Amino acid sequence: MKEKLTAAAYIAGWKVTSRLPKPLAKVLFEWGADVASKKGKGPEQLRRNLARVVGPENVTRDLVRRSMRSYMRYWREAFQLPAMAGRELAEELNRNFVPGSLELLHASAQSGRGTVIALPHAGNWDMAGVWLVHHYGTFTTVAERLKPESLFEAFVEYRESLGFKIIALTGSAVPPLEQMEEVLRGGGTVCLMGERDLTGRGVEVEFFGEKTSMPAGAALLAQRTGANLFTARVAFRGGSTDPSPARRGGPETWEHEVTPVAVEGQTLQQIVQEMADNFARGIAQDPQDWHLLQPLWFADLSQSRRQRLGLEEAPGEDA
């Protein structure tokens, strides 16, 4: 029942927000972010995560407030994206790539080898998808099967309406990895979120000086198919969250950058570690835009989860 109520509230909020004028939606979502930044498990874990990035002494109330505003800006834009999407938005996104990144993506598309892009949960990663659809027709990604099913179906319908192709992480007759391999061998593009290991079967890496695990999917796909592999940095610019006081308060826009990752001659662990290093550089540049409110590092996991991952023995087991 709780899941159904949550789904109903989410879908209702989605429909209401999509019809609100942008200035009103912005005020409401920033108010919600400011309230949420003061308490709750999510903001508390966000503080711990940000402490790894900027140092505990630099996790100020202002940084946490801007981080929560950035997180809520993502959801506001997600709810309003169908009305925003179009040629004008795609052209603006085109202008907001860091010099050299567009050329890398175009060259990869023209190579016919396929393109894999791994992104952290930062900025608005859906905007990268809008750009890909405008330029290349579509791209493929994987989504966690949310509960209840009605929420997952709404999520899929929304993103497919934007031109995204969605593969469920679980429940498919053909494994997701095989489906994505087929896309890449046809010269297509796959985008995957890259820093949260949802399955517990990821690759151990060092991230901001501490141990965690990250998904191996993007690296495996590049190894198996010969596709070009990139990590992406996605950040907000303007608005109330910009790290630059000079830009803060200006028109809301975005910034995108891609970095190639070496695959040939590298082990899986080396590839995923390079991806983690790239993510770290991007997150350090815009820590307020990293929307990770869940535990990531091994040190923050619950005892039961650490035991499931084999990081420590269960009580009563021999040492």
Task: Go through the PLM ranges and name each one.
Residues 111-171, 200-203, 242:
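Catalytic core of membrane glycerolipid acyltransferases/transacylases, capturing the structured
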Residues 56, 60-61, 65, 107-109, ...:
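Non-catalytic C-terminal accessory region of glycerolipid acyltransferases
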Residues 95-98, 122, 148, 170-174, ...:
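A conditional alpha-helix N-cap/helix-loop micro-motif detector
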Residues 12, 45, 103, 127, ...:
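Short Gly/charged-rich anion-binding patches and loops
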